[in-house]
């Protein structure tokens, strides 16, 4: 019995020694290998120029960061079937073969960040990594995301793509990432957010898009983001944001929109109304235009502050000059179109209210102020705001040539003022007519002259005429 137990102890010791030898014996010269807390091969900052040969097959963690590795060949880690963490960040990687990570079905964390020469990744590189939950591709100089790059990464929760040179978000790029909770896209060159950019991200909690060049967001871009709690869009080129894009964000708690060239005119009314109802935490939304509202927070304005339209008259240039954009401007919004609003609110910036600008001086028929009409009219006559009531001359008094409503002559025959018994006596009427030097026209000659003559004579003159005609009594 004792002999059997002694044999078992020797066998157990032999197995333990064999396992230790498998880890320690083949450890590459520049690396340190240890078993606790997990089987680890650690080779950071050793000046390595290639992936070392002879990494223990039992390794669960491999640290190769901070070296001079420029290429990851195919099947470099195929023997490491138990690998869960692989760090290759802060190297000089310029190429990763499509099959570099083949066989790593248990891999959970892959860090490729800080490899500025990488620039592109083969779409098949991450295929087969079904358990991967964290992927670092930040600061890799990436210029595009190839089709199908993240296909099959159903377990991915954290995706770091910040500080690259990405210019676009292709449709359905993240479609398979149904469990993704954090997406970092800040610090790129993205100019627009298309409709299908974030399709399939039903679990997304945090979306960071700040410090890009975003000028347009499609109204349905955030349709699948019902669980999103944090959205950063600050430091972009946004002058307007459709509230249709914000409507699906029912769980949103943190919103940052500052450092954008917001135009606070009639186009901002829907966003203003949405912000009034938003109960989460939001940054200021400083206005860029019109000039009278520059620097003021859109959230703190009144609805009647958002009047008129700031319309560029010359060649288009981006409003915010901090970052150039190749995007073309959209057409006039509905509230700025002539059939939706008075043309007086669609004006050229910088043009004063004067008789030389017929558009500003025009007052539509039936648009007179209530009451007796004696007060000055407040007309939003430029994209830079409403003129005060004390402006001289009042806009309602400006009637430049050609601004009268059609169908009414601008000048006509002048009618001679007549006499009215309401305000004149009979004698005053006679004297006034005689003093006017006029009398009648040619129609008063002949038989019709006597009544006109008698109307214009004094009582003494009338008596003399009657005496001459009838003779002395």
Swiss-Prot record:
Effect annotated for changing residue 277 to D: Decreases interaction with MAG
UniProt entry tagged with the keyword Disulfide bond: yes
Mutagenesis or variant effect for residue 399 to W: In SCZD; uncertain significance
Domain LRRNT residues, every copy: 27-54
Post-translation changes: N-glycosylated. O-glycosylated. Contains terminal sialic acid groups on its glycan chains.
Lineage, opening ranks: Eukaryota, Metazoa, Chordata, Craniata, Vertebrata
Residue span of region Disordered: 346-447
Residues glycosylated per entry: 82, 179
Protein name, entry field: Reticulon-4 receptor
Propeptide stretches in the record: 448-473
Major subcellular site: membrane
PANTHER family to which the protein is assigned, alphabetical: ANTIGEN BSP, PUTATIVE-RELATED, RETICULON-4 RECEPTOR
S-S bridge residues: 27-33, 31-43, 264-287, 266-335, 309-336
Ranges of Gly residues composition bias in the record: 434-445
Function: Receptor for RTN4, OMG and MAG. Functions as a receptor for the sialylated gangliosides GT1b and GM1. Besides, functions as a receptor for chondroitin sulfate proteoglycans. Can also bind heparin. Intracellular signaling cascades are triggered via the coreceptor NGFR. Signaling mediates activation of Rho and downstream reorganization of the actin cytoskeleton. Mediates axonal growth inhibition. Plays a role in regulating axon regeneration and neuronal plasticity in the adult central nervous system. Plays a role in postnatal brain development.
Associated disease: Schizophrenia: A complex, multifactorial psychotic disorder or group of disorders characterized by disturbances in the form and content of thought (e.g. delusions, hallucinations), in mood (e.g. inappropriate affect), in sense of self and relationship to the external world (e.g. loss of ego boundaries, withdrawal), and in behavior (e.g bizarre or apparently purposeless behavior). Although it affects emotions, it is distinguished from mood disorders in which such disturbances are primary.
Species of origin: Homo sapiens (Human)
Pfam family, one: LRR_8
Tissue specificity note: Widespread in the brain but highest levels in the gray matter. Low levels in heart and kidney; not expressed in oligodendrocytes (white matter).
GO CC, any one term: dendritic shaft
Keyword line: Cell membrane, Cell projection, Disease variant, Disulfide bond, Glycoprotein, GPI-anchor, Leucine-rich repeat, Lipid-binding, Lipoprotein, Membrane, Receptor, Repeat, Schizophrenia, Signal
InterPro entries to which the protein is assigned, alphabetical: Cys-rich_flank_reg_C (IPR000483), Leu-rich_rpt (IPR001611), Leu-rich_rpt_typical-subtyp (IPR003591), LRR_dom_sf (IPR032675), LRR_TM_domain-containing (IPR050541)
Residues covered by the LRRCT domain: 260-310
């Amino acid at each position: 019995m004792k002999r059997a137990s002694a044999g078992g102890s020797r066998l157990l010791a032999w197995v333990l020694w064999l396992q230790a030898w498998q880890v320690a014996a083949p450890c590459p010269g520049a690396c340190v290998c240890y078993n606790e807390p997990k089987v680890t091969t650690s080779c950071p900052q050793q000046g390595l120029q290639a992936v070392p040969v002879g990494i223990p097959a039992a390794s669960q963690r491999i640290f190769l960061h901070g070296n001079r590795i420029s290429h990851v060949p195919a099947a470099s880690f195929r023997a490491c079937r138990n690998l869960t963490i692989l760090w290759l960040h802060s190297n000089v990687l310029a190429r990763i073969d499509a099959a570099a990570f083949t066989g790593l079905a248990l891999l959970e964390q892959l860090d490729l960040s800080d490899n500025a020469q990488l620039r592109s990744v083969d779409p098949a590189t991450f295929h087969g990594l079904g358990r991967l939950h964290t992927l670092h591709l930040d600061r890799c100089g990436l210029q595009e995301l190839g089709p199908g790059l993240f296909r099959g990464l159903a377990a991915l929760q954290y995706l770091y793509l910040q500080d690259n040179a990405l210019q676009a978000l292709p449709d359905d790029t993240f479609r398979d990432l149904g469990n993704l909770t954090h997406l970092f896209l800040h610090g790129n060159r993205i100019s627009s957010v298309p409709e299908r950019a974030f399709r399939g991200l039903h679990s997304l909690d945090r979306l960071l898009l700040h410090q890009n060049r975003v000028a347009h967001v499609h109204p349905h871009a955030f349709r699948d983001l019902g669980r999103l709690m944090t959205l950063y869009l600050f430091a972009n080129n946004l002058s307007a944001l459709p509230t249709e894009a914000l409507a699906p964000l029912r769980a949103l708690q943190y919103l940052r929109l500052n450092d954008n060239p917001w135009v606070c005119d009639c186009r901002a009314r829907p966003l203003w109304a949405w912000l009034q109802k938003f109960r989460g935490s939001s940054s200021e939304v400083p206005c860029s235009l019109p000039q009278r509202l520059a620097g003021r927070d859109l959230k703190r304005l009144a609805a009647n502050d958002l009047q008129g339209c700031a319309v560029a008259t010359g060649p288009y240039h981006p409003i915010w000059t901090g970052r150039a954009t190749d995007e073309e401007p959209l057409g006039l919004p509905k509230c700025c179109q002539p059939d939706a609003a008075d043309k007086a609110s669609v004006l050229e910036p910088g043009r004063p209210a004067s008789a030389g600008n017929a558009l500003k001086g025009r007052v539509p028929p039936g648009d007179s102020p209530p009451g007796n009409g004696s007060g000055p009219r407040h007309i939003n006559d430029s994209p830079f705001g409403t003129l005060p009531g004390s402006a001289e001359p009042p806009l309602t008094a400006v009637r430049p040539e050609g601004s009268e409503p059609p169908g009414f002559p601008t000048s006509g025959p002048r009618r001679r003022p007549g006499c009215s018994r309401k305000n004149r006596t009979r004698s005053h009427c006679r004297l006034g007519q005689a003093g006017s030097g006029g009398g009648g026209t040619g129609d008063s000659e002949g038989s019709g002259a006597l009544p006109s003559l008698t109307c214009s004579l004094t009582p003494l003159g009338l008596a003399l005429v009657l005496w001459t005609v009838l003779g002395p009594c």
